[in-house]
Amino acid sequence: FEENEGYKKLAEFLGMRDNGWRVCSNKLFYLAVPPQHYKAIFQNLAFSGLTKPCSPEEGWTRVIVEKPFGKDLKTAQELDRMLGKLFCEEQIYRMDHYLGKETVQNILAFRFSNSFLQDSWNKMGIERVSIRLLEKEGIGNRGAFYDGLGALRDVGQNHLLQLLSLFCMDSPTKFDGDSLRRERAKVLKALPVLSADDVKAHAKRGQYQGYSKEKDVDPSSQTETYFQIQTFLNNDIWKGVPILLESGKAMKESLVEVPRRIRS
C-alpha cells in the first residue's frame, strides 16, 4: 500500500487498456483495508493521477471506503478532511455494506409501508428499543485485524448505529438517497456524548473465553469481543425511551434483532 510505484504502473496499465479499446472507462476503487493504510492509499491514488477520469466529457473515477474508518473520532475526521482535499465529494462513497442486507432493508419496508404504525412509532407507543447483533462464531482467522479493533469499532459504531437510525428515523419527505441519509443523520446527531460516569454506569464490555489464545491475538489483549451500551435520543420523538445496543462474538446463538417493547 505504501509504494507509489505500483500505483503508477496501475495508472499506465489502465491508460493502455483505454487506448487499446478506444474508450474512456469508468474506474472504481473499493477500499476494504485496515484503517492504518487509508492515508497512503488516498495519497498514492491522487498523486498517480488515478483519481482523474481520462476525459472531462465521459468516464468517471470513484473511491469507496469501508469501515473501519479511522481508529477514533480524531483520526476519522483527519481522514475525511484528506478525502475532501484529494477527491471531489461526488467521487467519494462512504460505505457500510450492512445496509445492503435484506434484514436491514426490511426495516424501512415494514415501517413505512404500514401507515397504521406511524402514530405509535414514537415515545408514546414504544417503551424500549434494543438493537442486537450476536454471532455464534469467534473471530476465525481475523486475529491480527480484529485485535486492533474490537467489537465496538467493528460493528457498533457502524452496523448497530445504522440499524438504530433506520428504526428511529422520521418519515422522509421523499424515498431517495439524499432524503433517507438526511433523516438517518438526524437520529445520529440526537445521540448524546457519554461521559466517563455514563460509561461506568451504562456500558459493559467483555471477552470470550479463549480469545487471547486465538491466532495472531496478543496473549495479554484487552480487546472486547462483547459490548452492551444503554443510551437514549435527545429529540422530541424518542425522549425518555431507553435504547440498548448490544453485540458479541462466540455467543450462544447468532441473531440480528431489533425488538421493541410496546407500551400497554
List where the protein language model places each region.
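Secretory/organelle targeting and membrane-embedding segments
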Residues: 1-65, 69-264
